[in-house]
Structures are given as structure tokens and as C-alpha cells.
């Protein structure tokens, strides 16, 4: 999402030392975002087992959106910020701004879809997940992640709907008389600010909060069920030791999953909430938010594109192993039988009258999906959702 006022530098501009430090920082952010998202895409394309997992379609599409942000949006913003001038012309300014809004919104939409996918997988019965997340529905969700943002990016920006009523102010801020420089200024009127913020952030944010809250509640209820089973079987000497170990592992898994949810939502809010709160407030206070504040909030949102590979892929054991194999040139030390397709034990529990299968893969941090089969004695073996 582009800044509303591109005139972000002070009147004196940056000194030589400040420029070097700033350029180093911005280059590091861009490079990490490019490499991280590329690695995620290569891992899924390279490993057949990862391609079988439904959630990974969203992960790859998210990585592609974030990769485009880091290639098509961030570098031009960094150049303008460091050089304190826009040198690419007015038409490309509109194109870059439209790409900025399109790609960052698409990235946020993908995060929302991942949360909904995990909600159906963890909080609903297996057959519900299979019926909800069909290949057609996944394709429609992915298409929506890319098509819907065009209605708040290229369409209104190219038509100039965002600057109706504030054209004079925009023209004034495009030119810096002190440095004789021009800027790529993107400012929005009140209707566009509200519409864009609600569609691009507040609705996805609300859906993510609701989905992850339900996942958290389900995980806690599942852990409570296991704890009750432990207490009930504590007095029985016939209780197998392996069952105790498995229950303990499950509780640790659920605790880790809950912590991961907090990390995911915390990073998302930290990165994007400041920008979108300011995005709505600024038009109502006569555009008095300092340019430096806009720059800080904007790049905080960009950093989210570099964090997503770590949150949604690097925390997953299967992805990590694939990364090691790719980076170490297919080193045999990182291979093992059924390397990324091992069967993950699951436990079942009854919550609110419904039997659920909560995968051990919840510990994998936000992505959670895995090839997973309940114990052979479980009545849900036949109902287990397929990842193919």
C-alpha cells in the first residue's frame, strides 16, 4: 500500500552517512524478502509431498505476491527515499502506486485465506473440511485474492477517483521548491481512504481474528480433554506409558500452536495496523501527518512481506527440511525415508458433541497442514480429510 504523501524527506534531505545507513537497511529488507519468498516457491515446486498439501497453494501464491512487492514496489520506493526525488515520470508513478496497492492488498487477502483454511481444517469435522476446501473453491479463493484488489488499485487510481477534491494539494506537494525535486505523491480523499482501508485491511483483519480465536479455543479444549484423560487414567496401572508420553506431547503441541497464533496475529497487526489507522485518520485532520511517519508505517508494512516466509513456511518442519536440502545441494544428510511425507500421528477428541482430529502439524506455525492419519483404532480413519 503506497504512502499518501510521498514527500517524506526533510527539507534538507539525508546526509551522506544517513543515506548509507538507510540504503543498507532498505537493501537488506528487500533482499531478505526476495530470497525468502523465492525459497518458499522453489521448495513447493521441488517437493512433490509439499505440493499435495492444500494450504501450500495459498502459501505459494502469498510468496509470489510478496516477491512481486519486493521486486516491483520496494526498490523504487527505496530509490526515491534515498535520492529524495522521483525520476521515473508521472505515468510510472501511477503504475507503481497501483501495483503497490494491488500487491500489498493481495498479500493481506492471502493471509486471510490461510486463516480460513486452517479454521475449516482444525475446528470443523474432517468431512466438512473436505467439502469446503475443494480444488474449485481453492481456485476461486486464490482468484479472488488477485482480482478483488484491482477494484481498489488500478481502477480508481488510473481514473483519478482517489484524488477528487484534493488535486490542488497533490500538485502542491509534488514539487519541492527548496530542492527543485519532484515526488511520486499519492494522496487519497475520504471516501477512498475509508473504502480502501476497510476492504484491504479491516475486513481481512476481523476474519483472521475470528478464525484464529476459534482455532485457539479448539486447541485449548482439546488440551483440556487430554488433561482429563490423563487424570482419569493416572490411578490405573494398566495405562500404557506411551499414552502418557503422547498426551504430554499433545499438550505441548497445543501450547506451541497457541503461541504461534499470537506471533502471527501480533506480527500482522504490528506491521499493518499503524498504516491503515493513519490512512483513515489523515484525511480527517487535513493531511497533517508528517511524511516521516508515513514512511515509517509504509515500510513497516513492507517488512511484513519479508516476515511472511518465516511465519508461514520456515516454522514448518517439512519446509525447513526442504530448504536445507535445496541450500545444501541435495545433501543426503538431510534426507530420510519418506522425507517430507511422513505420517504424523494425530489424536482425536470430542468437543461440543463433535469428534475432532487435531493434527500434530498445528505445531508447524500458521501453516499446520500435514499428511496426518489418526491411530488405527480411531473411528475417523475413513473420514480423515485427504491432502491430495
From Swiss-Prot:
Q: Where are the transmembrane segments?
A: 20-44, 55-78, 93-117, 134-157, 189-212, 258-283, 291-314
Q: How does it sit in the membrane?
A: Multi-pass membrane protein
What InterPro entries does the record tag this protein with?
5HT4_rcpt, GPCR_Rhodpsn, GPCR_Rhodpsn_7TM
Tell me what effect the entry lists for residue 193 to F/V. Answer: Decreased G-protein coupled receptor activity
What's an example GO cellular component term for this entry? endosome membrane
Q: Name one GO biological process term.
A: regulation of appetite
- Keywords, sorted A to Z: Cell membrane, Disulfide bond, Endosome, G-protein coupled receptor, Glycoprotein, Membrane, Receptor, Transducer, Transmembrane, Transmembrane helix
Q: Subcellular location, in the record's words?
A: Cell membrane; Endosome membrane
Residues engaged in binding serotonin: 100, 279
Question: Which segments sit on the Extracellular face?
Answer: 1-19, 79-92, 158-188, 284-290
Mutation effect (residue 272 to A):
Abolished G-protein coupled receptor activity
Say if the entry is tagged with keyword Transcription.
Answer: no
Q: Which residues lie on this side of the membrane: Cytoplasmic?
A: 45-54, 118-133, 213-257, 315-388
Instruction: Note one Pfam family from the annotation.
Output: 7tm_1
Name which cysteines form disulfide bonds.
93-184
Q: What is the effect of changing residue 104 to A?
A: Decreased G-protein coupled receptor activity
> What family does the Swiss-Prot or TrEMBL record give for this protein?
Belongs to the G-protein coupled receptor 1 family.
Partners and quaternary state?
Interacts (via C-terminus 330-346 AA) with GRK5; this interaction is promoted by 5-HT (serotonin).
**How does the entry describe the domains?**
Specificity for G(s) G alpha proteins is determined by the length of transmembrane regions 5 and 6 (TM5 and TM6).
Function, in words: G-protein coupled receptor for 5-hydroxytryptamine (serotonin), a biogenic hormone that functions as a neurotransmitter, a hormone and a mitogen. Ligand binding causes a conformation change that triggers signaling via guanine nucleotide-binding proteins (G proteins) and modulates the activity of downstream effectors. HTR4 is coupled to G(s) G alpha proteins and mediates activation of adenylate cyclase activity.
What protein does this entry describe?
5-hydroxytryptamine receptor 4
| Gene it is expressed from | HTR4
